[in-house]
A protein has these predicted regions:
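Extracytoplasmic
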Residues: 1-208
Length: 208
């Protein structure tokens, strides 16, 4: 109890019912600003999304990713309506056309910089290449290759990924105790890990 999760509104009831946790929005949310806020966080870069999540006391972020399983009803395929709702309130900050590449909604290396840098994209493909020996992996939901390099996250920690990678949960980091910007603190920790045993590059590395 006391833990708040950020997810698409359609998952709010399930999270509340099965996990006894509150969500920022759910199916019954009538306040369009709340829904747009979730969309804004997902559509923003980590740098811009982190203050939004912290302001609303979000502890965890849950997404549904169908790339490995081939589930086309995942959050990346629902992402555009989140972008549109957010653009309605913040047209100067969230602009749908910036998520397209030459008019196409792409997820491979030809995806737009805005798409590749947004929180939704990073959470979806974080460590995905680990399953394919470090190479780009096939996204079966979109019938396209994913990015050649898996995105890294500075402000979130992966705490759960289901065996088929459908459910992914990330914990929002607290501010660094030494006052460092989180990207700098993360880079320092990554440097320390280079001297430790490597994280296994296969599906067994999933956090259960």
């Amino acid at each position: 109890t006391g833990v708040q999760t950020c997810a698409l509104p359609i998952y709010g009831y399930q999270i509340a019912g099965f996990a006894d946790r509150t969500t920022l929005v759910d199916n019954n949310t009538w306040n369009n600003t709340h829904i747009a806020t979730v969309g804004k966080a997902m559509a923003s870069s980590e740098e811009r999304a982190y203050p939004i999540l912290r302001k609303h006391d979000v502890d965890y972020v849950l997404i549904i990713f169908g790339g490995l399983l081939g589930y086309s009803g995942d959050d990346l395929n629902k992402f555009l309506w989140m972008i549109r709702i957010s653009q309605g309130l913040w047209p100067d900050e969230i602009q749908e056309h910036k998520f397209f590449s030459n008019g196409e909604y792409r997820v491979d290396d030809q995806a737009s910089a805005t798409m590749r840098n947004c929180l939704m994209y990073k959470m979806s493909y974080h460590r995905y290449n680990d399953l394919f020996g470090g190479r780009a992996g096939m996204d079966r939901a979109r019938n396209a290759m994913g990015p050649s390099t898996s995105p890294t996250l500075d402000t979130l920690d992966e705490v759960f990924t289901s065996e088929n990678w459908l459910v992914r949960i990330y914990q929002v980091k607290k501010e660094d105790t030494l006052g460092r910007p989180l990207p700098l603190a993360h880079a320092f920790e990554q440097g320390k890990r280079l001297h430790q045993a490597p994280f296994p590059l296969n599906a067994d590395a999933i956090v259960h």
